Amino acid sequence: MADSDADTTDAPSLRTPIVAVLGHVDHGKTSLLDKIRGSAVSEGEAGAITQHIGSTAVPLEVISTIAGDLVDPTDFDLPGLLFIDTPGHHSFSTLRSRGGALADIAILVVDVNDGFQPQTEEAVDILQRTETPFVVAANKIDTVPGWNPEPDRPSKLAIESQTDRVQSDVTERLYEIIGELSSADFSADMYWRVQDFANNVGVVPVSAETGEGVPDLLTVLMGLSQRYMRDEMAIDV
């Protein structure tokens, strides 16, 4: 019977994917994590968010609330996401390298005003060497001149609501980052244009300050983990 085939009691138990956050100093790694934490705390029940030094566990139900219509919790059997911060200073490159290697997936935070910087390139090298899947959080879109804040809104919609001039400016900055990824031998595009995340890097425009793109970022991370790393998340119970 179809019902027995769909019985979820035989589904494997899955662990929480570990998400490393990397990027150049002052590009907004910690601010982005703080925004995710803040959104999670405000949307979750007391005690739902587990925080340790340098790490934050955000359960699926909280991610679903933050992401809104972008995430249907019934589509996922992962328990949530565990974010780990990695030190931004050059002297911590060894520790950051270890953090990258320990992660299942990573967020590479890049300031849309600065593009790739030395520690960005170092982070990309770490991700290449450890073969860690990653997405790019193109941060600080709220600092583009003329940007009209759309707090906590999906970034594609937030960008489309801006004036033509601002849209053009944002798009130009994003494609400069995509070009830099191409120079590092990564095929990349705006996340909503990527059909094959196994072979292409998704770029998610975000604002750690006003929250645009945070729903998208969480959605992409959950989707990548569920679709491409589900077997790696399976645990014996």
What are these regions (language model features)?
Residues 2-86:
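Conserved G1/Walker A P-loop phosphate-binding module
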Residues 2-9, 40-47, 60-71, 92-94, ...:
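Active-site phosphate-binding and catalytic loops of NTP-dependent enzymes
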Residues 39, 63, 88-90, 112-116, ...:
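Conserved nucleotide-binding/hydrolysis micro-motifs of P-loop NTPases
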Residues 93-114, 128-135:
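Inter-motif core of Ras-like GTPase G domains
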